[in-house]
Amino acid sequence: MIPTSKGKNTKTQPPLSRMTRDELEDSLFRLREEHMLVKELFWKQQDEIKRMRTALLRLTASGRGLRAEAAADESSGSPLNGGGTESGGTAPSSTSVPRCPGSSCSSSAWAPLLPAAPSLASTRDTDSSTPPGHRAEKPKRESRDRLSYTAPPTFKEHVTNEKARGEVASEPSELGHLMTSDTMQVEEPPKSPEKMWSKDENFAQRSSLESTQKATELRASIKENIQLIRLKKLLHERNTSLAVTKAQLTEVQAAYETLLHKNQGILGAAHNALLSQVNELRAELKEESKKAVSLKSQMEDVSILQITLKEFQERVEDLEKERKLLNDNYDKLLESMLDSSNQPQWSHELGEQLQQKVSQLQDQLDVEMKEKREILLQLSQEKAQNKDLELEVTSLLQKHKQEVEDLQNISTFSQSPDRQSAPATHPALFQETIQIQPCEPKNQEEKKLSQMLSELQVSHAETTLELEKTRDMLILQRKINVCYQEELEAMMTKADNENKDHEAKLERLNQLLDLKNKRINQLEEQLKDVAYGTRQLPLCLKPLPAHENEDKVDISPWHQSENLFELHIHQAFLTSAALAQAGDTQPTTFCTYSFYDFETHCTPLVVGPQPLYDFTSQYVVEIDSLFLHYLQGASAQLDLHQAIASEHHTLAAGWICFDRVLETVERVHGSATLTGTGGEVFGVLEYWMRLRFPIRSSLQAYNKRKKAQAYLAANVLGAWEAQKDEPRSGTWKNQNELRVEIIRCCGLRSRSLGAQPSPYVMYRFFTFSDHDTTIIPASSNPYFRDLARFPVLVTSDLDQYLRREALSVYVFDDEDSEPGSYLGRVQVPLLPLAQNKSIQGDFNLTDPVGEPNGSVQVHLDWGSCYLPPENFPKPEAQSEEDTRDGLETSIEEEEASFPPQDQMVSIDTPTEAGQYQAKRKPPQVGERKEREHQVAGYSRRKHGRKTGLQGKNRMEYLSHNLLNGNTLQQVKYIEWKFSGLKISADHVLKNQQKEEEMTSSYSAQILKETPHPVNDKEFCEQASEGSEAQTTDSDEIVTPVSQKCPKADSEKMCIEIVSLAFYPEAEVMCDENVEQVYVEYRFYDLPLSETETPVSLRKPRAGEEIYFHFSKVIDLDPVEQKERRQFLFTMLIGEDPEQGHLKFTVVSDPIEEEKKECQEVGYAYLELWPMLVSGRDILEQDLDIVGPEDQATPIGKLKVSLQAAAALQAIYKEMTEDLCS
């Protein structure tokens, strides 16, 4: 009956998916109203049935009484017979009366008999007037006529079984017929009392059996009808919910289609953008190639310029020769200039004529010069003769005067006194006569001499005039020569400038060409690495065969690294247990499943115990390592749901594994067992899956694409790279720049077999931050070409660092998630740098086990010539005030001119250069007490689509290996050191600073420095403050500012907590309350906040070791920290409660969410007396950890280091001497 009803509903009912919401609501309200009407009609008919039943019982009782009276009258009115008849006639009535209420105890049981109840009532009403033959058919006819009116028209289609409906309607008619026949038999006159008695008994028995049988059949039919009505109502409700579900499904499908179209549009736009980017990159490559060609052409032009430069040099030499000719022929040029002043401008012909004239004038000038020389010689001779004549004349005059004087003297002695007047006059006359007599020849000679003198004067005047003319000519020639010389110098200067410009341009072009060649080589190497360095996975996949009936898929917009994964859900076979659980032999089911990171897919609804879904999901995936790991190890859950109207519930679930799809490119068929919630098997689901394209080529294309993107990101080349750095100011002569270039690595092997590493290089130079290169994905021979520049001040500390230390270069694998692991490590010695030599070559890498693992090519060189600090010239001594002023001025100039010492410039990755710059200021005199510790944190980088994996080994490595005895434990270098500055003797402090190290082969090295001239007390205060606050842990390195008053080994001690591990059999490993632990120790007056590890680490697993790397430097100054020294002495001699050992306590630290107190887990003891006896520091010694209760059984080991041998010996010696004295 149910399938027929369902089929009828399917034909007449309109499709619910096409009905609107308003129509559905109207139909719902209409059905609700019809339901209320039917319910009211049902209660009315039930009340009517009750009334009819009471009337029927009364009529039955009255009919039997009438039959009994009639029988008594006919049998002669015997009281015995009448009593027997009455008792016999009422017996069936008494048995049937209580049965009738029992059959109608439930109101719902009479609901199917509603059409028959009025017919019974009408039969009883017409008992007395209607003949028996007609009474049997009237109820049946009326029941059939009223059957179609007992329910609303909507439910007519649900009544499909006419036979069952006729039986239900005919049963009351037969009952009425039996009752009328009984009445007819009662009305017949009995013939005899015994016969009537037997007939009554037979009739009562027969009627009771028949009534019992009829009542049973009626009850069964009523139950079936009730069940039928319930099923129809349930079917109607499920149809309604199914319609709602279909409507929702259509809405979801429409939304999914719109979202799919939108996503496809977005993917298309993204693909177009990628294509445009590729085109742009190609265009840029073409432009770069054009630039390279242009540079080559420029190089050819440069060669031409070199030829022209040589020609220009030859011209300069010719000009030098011409200059010499001009100096030799200045007279000719003078005359030519004088003659050319009255002539028009020179031409080529006039130039030749003038040259001829100049040559003639030069000849004339030579002749005149010869004549002038002869005249000058004659003039000199005549002057000499004239001088001789003058000497002769002067000598003659003197001789003549002498003779005259002699004569006068003689005359005076010969004359007498009386005759004195006469002789006095006589000599005068005599003298005149004497004078007159020789004057005549003398006058003649004088005339000759005067005549010769006049002639000589005339010739001398002429010569002087000629000489003045010559001098003027020479002066003019000098001026002309000066003009020519200035012009020549200007031309030479211009030529030199042009030559320098050409040389600078040539050098610039050479630099650009070298840079371009380097860039081309880098791109070639990277292209080779991308094209040939990406290995294929060892997957043996055959090419996909062509299927004729296969859906065509458009793969034009896909990338080479993408693939199409298909998952087909074929058919499910449900067991009888599943059908029983579903409660239906024809259940409506569908499947849901999700794959990778895509959305959940749903199959269509299918009806039947063996639903055939035939549904295929297609996923466009990118073949990478994550997807391969998913296919190899993951499985997807498939849920089987049963749909009931608008609701559904999960019937069973199964799992689909994808590992076999990697073995072939054909369809991989499989079956999943469907299990219920209780674990019972509900059936089997068949499916198949495949990859449309070979996975090996897709994975290789993905690795190539990823590697190319990494190279493109690393090869950002700024315009400033080609510019040559301008020379810095010469304020400080001891500044330099170190260039460290990581070129490439070769032959790297990953720790995972069959995989390629994603390497990057990391190193630290001097006091600078850690520098790391870019990450090259999936490459065994990465080409980095990473250049970092470190500006430094050449000090004694730097020189000692270069001579004693080596540059530790580490190569990490970004794909390796194990903490503390690296691919390779190498120590590059820096001694050649201290000798002003460069370092270049391939260095072999060794893994943590010590096995070789490839090589790294590095190049280190100086930007300028390196001079050791002792070779720098020292300025002269100055006064105290001048020195202080000069120091302040030089510090300010240094701040303005010299960049910070820890600044690094990365050439190939300028965008990341700022990540490793730490802001440092030069120390000022008034701010030395305000210095704080600088914390250098190691940051991680992210690459590709993964988050949190890229660069994660750096912090873990530095907490595991970098500080674990392989490199510098703590760096204490001075930022600003003025080693070449000599100040007055009162303010110069010569101290030594010890550089503390924790290495496997040696303990400490001493570095020299020349600090600033500041008060010793301030230095010591700052040193004590800095030493007490120096701590390191597993994630940080605390680097204090340099101490200006470094402590000696005998004035400090360093305690380091390295690592912690528990034994697997220890009770603490099973204690769930212990989740995090830290380590502490007590030392005299130090608070626990300074002697406990700053962070709590999770409890180590079995066989695992956790690293703290917490160090503490304790000041043991003999003057300021006497109590601490006394405390250590009491520990050594055994008077302290600690009994000569240092006690470490391992404490459990509860999680913040749990409000619990810390509890002590174990203790470790470090003996001090053996260190005092041996005189050696303890480096990473394992101490047994014992429990707080059982002090005999170790539960783990604690690795610590203690540098206090020198301090303990000094304290013991000092205290024993004090005790003895």
UniProtKB/Swiss-Prot annotation:
Domain of life: Eukaryota
Major location (coarse): other
Keyword Coiled coil belongs to the record: yes
Annotated GO biological process: non-motile cilium assembly; visual perception
UniProt keyword annotations, A-Z: Cell projection, Cilium, Coiled coil, Sensory transduction, Vision
Domain C2 stretches: 723-843
Coiled coil location: 267-533
Entry's transmembrane regions: none
InterPro entries for the chain: C2-C2_1, C2_dom, C2_domain_sf, RPGRIP1_C, RPGRIP1_fam
Pfam families assigned: C2 (PF00168), C2-C2_1 (PF11618), RPGR1_C (PF18111)
Gene3D superfamilies the UniProt entry points to: C2 domain (2.60.40.150)
Region called Disordered, residue ranges: 1-22, 68-107, 119-196, 869-947
Entry's Gene Ontology cellular component terms: photoreceptor connecting cilium
Comp. bias regions, Basic and acidic residues: 134-147, 155-168
Intracellular or extracellular location(s): Cell projection, Cilium
Composition bias, Polar residues: 1-15, 88-97, 903-914
Tissues expressing this chain: Retina, brain, skeletal muscle and kidney. Colocalizes with RGPR in the outer segment of rod photoreceptors and cone outer segments.
Region (Interaction with RPGR): 1027-1216
Quaternary structure and interacting proteins, as annotated: Forms homodimers and elongated homopolymers. Interacts with NPHP4. Interacts with NEK4. Interacts with RPGR. Interacts with SPATA7. Interacts with CEP290/NPHP6; mediating the association between RPGR and CEP290/NPHP6.
Comment text on domains: The C2 domain does not bind calcium ions, and does not bind phosphoinositides.
Membership in a protein family: Belongs to the RPGRIP1 family.
Physiological role: May function as scaffolding protein. Required for normal location of RPGR at the connecting cilium of photoreceptor cells. Required for normal disk morphogenesis and disk organization in the outer segment of photoreceptor cells and for survival of photoreceptor cells.
Name assigned to this protein: X-linked retinitis pigmentosa GTPase regulator-interacting protein 1
